[in-house]
Amino acid sequence: MSRVAKAPVAIPAGVEVKLNGQEITVKGAKGELTRVLNDAVVIAQEENNLTFGPKEGVANAWAQAGTARALVNNMVVGVTEGFTKKLTLKGVGYRAAIKGNAVGLTLGFSHPVEHELPAGIKAECPSQTEIVITGCDKQLVGQVAADIRSYRQPEPYKGKGVRYADENVRTKEAKKK
């Protein structure tokens, strides 16, 4: 049984929540997010709290309620504070630059790589080897960061490539003669 679903989600001041059946819309200073939740979940709004519970007679409804609570909590945090992912480029000649609504990457290929940013996602480059991705949708921020990382994942011998700032890449020892 999920214990996550038992904790209510607090709605801070400045955040507006609309319930329309199983569709929930959260609006705040950083943006607006909408999500359709599973039918096995019962949502109730009481003043400044959202409570989640299982629908009677549905298998794994507690698990679905816990998932729904975590998703809605991430929506509330996203529209108030936002989410950030930091990427670091390591390698000779590896560079990043913002070009309009895209991130331009030089990653040792014979051509530069341009990654278009979806709506609601912002990127900035504090230096040529750092990319900071921000947005209100946690899933989308993580997906954009993973897409950029996938162009050149860190290799295990020298650690060259695009990595998350907090990622620890295990390096292997080179072959001995």
Curated annotation (Swiss-Prot):
GO molecular function: rRNA binding; structural constituent of ribosome
Listed Gene3D superfamilies: Ribosomal protein L6, alpha-beta domain (3.90.930.12)
Superkingdom to which the source organism belongs: Bacteria
UniProt keyword terms in alphabetical order: Ribonucleoprotein, Ribosomal protein, RNA-binding, rRNA-binding
UniProt GO cellular component terms: cytosolic large ribosomal subunit
Family listed: Belongs to the universal ribosomal protein uL6 family.
This protein's name: Large ribosomal subunit protein uL6
